[in-house]
Amino acid sequence: MVRCLWAAECCWLPPKRKQPFEDTMYTTYVARQPILNAKRHTLGYELLFRDGEKNAFPEYMDADRATYRLIVENFLSLGTNPRIARSRCFINFPHKSLIRRLPLTLPREQIVVEILETCQPTDDLFEAVQELSQRGYLLALDDFVYSPAWERFLPYVQIVKIDIMAMGLDKACEFVRGRLAQGSRRRFLAERVETEDEFHQARHAGFTFFQGYFFSKPEIIKQRYVSPEHVIAMQLFREVCQPEVDYVRVERLVAQDIALSYKLLRFVNTMSDRISVSISSFRQALVYLGQDKLRIFVSLAVASYISSKKPKELYNLSLQRAQFCQLMATHTHFKAHREQAFLIGMFSVLDALLDTSIEQLVEQLPLADDVKLALREREGPLGTLLDLEECFEKADWQGVEQHCLELGFDLEDVRQELIEAQRWSQDINRLI
């Protein structure tokens, strides 16, 4: 009789999974040109935005937009571009990007901030340069042509890049000799070095670094990256996995996307029966709900957000597994994971939601080793619990009974929790 009931209430069986990256991955292009020292050892690369395999900057592209895309696609995606991850990267920043402190989104030990030659030496730019220098960022003046207005910037700049073709090799060498004779501690980089003779002349004049076709043309690198929306989702999942959630940071992340903010407030207002007032802000939700409940609401909103282009049943499945693990967290085996139980269930389908391997995803989340093992291999008590839930989804009643025996659970108690989790997930879907 029990088996007939389960068969009638069995939930949706997921379809065959698509290939990884099919829906959420995009192709990005970046050109890199090496920067070398006097011994011709590569010290880093200048990164140049490209929108295709043609090795040229697209004429239609605004410089600020190009910088933003280069950063998002190569640094802020799910995993830094592996072809640039171990090198110091020289990145061009236009005036607006510097004023907005865009370089602060990147690790200071990995980049050199190039102040683009189109920048005007305004007070706003000077304040930005001062702050970046105080925060430990290396700064370079790109295609530098001296004018007194730039003099106050020089103490905060470590590298001065000079286009020896535009300035003229003799004039460039004379300028560098003069500055070094005055005691300048700046390092000078010769750009557009195209012959061995130019390299030797620039080196003897006092240039420290070199870049140009004589060493290497810019190399196009093509890779796949995850959409910015999914980057925000992973950042939020990382935050709610922490034992002590930084809700100030969570609020900032949620505020980056209007659709996500709306989903969160909709969840809070729809599902919180005991709140008599309408919740209109994240801070208000935190006050009324407390951290534990808000952790769950954020998880629900993010899962809904990233599953908008997926079958609704997949989102329903993520809710069902999350709620089942939450209900089972009261049992002895899982008390140590009570705070993360909901997330463990939800993360068991995260690979399907993001079209990315579970191995790659769990390494980016601050989870205990036994949780990672359960999600990757379905091993340990948590892995057995997830296996049990999956057997229920597939109407594998023999598997359900076997896993109940392994965990020491009463079959009827587990059945009730499974049905309750299924009912709860369906109710949530109806509410939203």
From Swiss-Prot:
Keywords: c-di-GMP, Hydrolase. The keyword Hydrolase applies. It catalyses: 3',3'-c-di-GMP + H2O = 5'-phosphoguanylyl(3'->5')guanosine + H(+). Residues 226-413 form the HDOD domain. It holds the Pfam family EAL. Disruption phenotype: Deletion mutant exhibits decreased motility. Mutation causes a slight decrease in flaA expression but does not affect flagellar morphology. Mutant has enhanced biofilm formation and vps gene expression. The keyword Protein biosynthesis does not apply. GO terms for molecular function: cyclic-guanylate-specific phosphodiesterase activity. Its EC number is 3.1.4.52. Gene3D superfamilies: EAL domain, Hypothetical protein af1432. InterPro entries: dGMP_Pdiesterase_EAL/HD-GYP (IPR014408), EAL_dom (IPR001633), EAL_sf (IPR035919), HDOD (IPR013976), RNase_Y/CdgJ (IPR052340). Coiled coil: none annotated. Residues 1-232 form the EAL domain. Phosphodiesterase (PDE) that catalyzes the hydrolysis of cyclic diguanylate (c-di-GMP). Positively regulates motility and negatively regulates biofilm formation. This is Cyclic di-GMP phosphodiesterase CdgJ. It comes from Vibrio cholerae serotype O1 (strain ATCC 39315 / El Tor Inaba N16961). The gene is cdgJ.
